[in-house]
Amino acid sequence: MKKNLLGFTFASLLFTTGSAVAAEYKIDKEGQHAFVNFRIQHLGYSWLYGTFKDFDGTFTFDEKNPSADKVNVTINTNSVDTNHAERDKHLRSAEFLNVAKFPQATFTSTSVKKEGDELDITGNLTLNGVTKPVTLEAKLMGQGDDPWGGKRAGFEAEGKIKLKDFNITTDLGPASQEVELIISVEGVQQK
C-alpha cells in the first residue's frame, strides 16, 4: 500500500513537462506546496488515505513541446503517514514497503504526451526493489509569477498501481489490490 503510494508520488513528479527551452523547476516541499498522497480500499468498506512526507524532485516544463519534458522524484519511504502509528509501522515492514532494505522509491519519466488538456506522463517507478512503468494523468493547474519575484508552475496528477507489481503480496482482499495516487505539486523555477 505504501509502496504503491511511493509509485504514485514518483508519478506525480513525472507530470511536469519540458523542452529545448524548457524551464527547470524544483518541487516546493519546504513551503508545503507539494503532496504525494495515496488511497486504497479497506476491505471494500471505506478508503484508507496516506501520504509521504519526505520527497524531493525536479521537472522541466515547456507548454510548446511537452514531449521533451522530464520528471525526477525521490521519495523516502520511511516517511509514509496514514495518521495511525501502528499501521505506519506495519507499512514500513518487509510485508509492504520494506524500508530497511529499500529506503527510497524513485520515479524517472520516459515520455510525456499531451492528450487534450492533460498530460500522460509515463516513467519508471522503482518501489520495493522493483522497477515498472507507470503512467500518470496530469493537468497544469497554473503558472506565473509569485509574490517573491520568482516563477512557479503547479500540476495535479493521478494514477493507479497494483501492489503485486511491486512485490507487495500481503493479501488485503480483492477490493484492495490497487493503490490510487493523488499528487499535487508546485515547482519553483530555477535560475
Swiss-Prot record:
Its main location: periplasm. InterPro entries: Lipid/polyisoprenoid-bd_YceI, TTHA0802/YceI-like_sf, UPF0312/YceI. Gene3D superfamilies: Lipid/polyisoprenoid-binding, YceI-like. It is found in: Periplasm. Keywords: Periplasm, Signal. The keyword Iron-sulfur does not apply. Coiled coil: none annotated. One of its GO terms (cellular component) is periplasmic space. Residues 1-22 form the signal peptide. It comes from the Bacteria. Belongs to the UPF0312 family. Type 1 subfamily. This is Protein YceI. It comes from Salmonella agona (strain SL483). The gene is yceI.
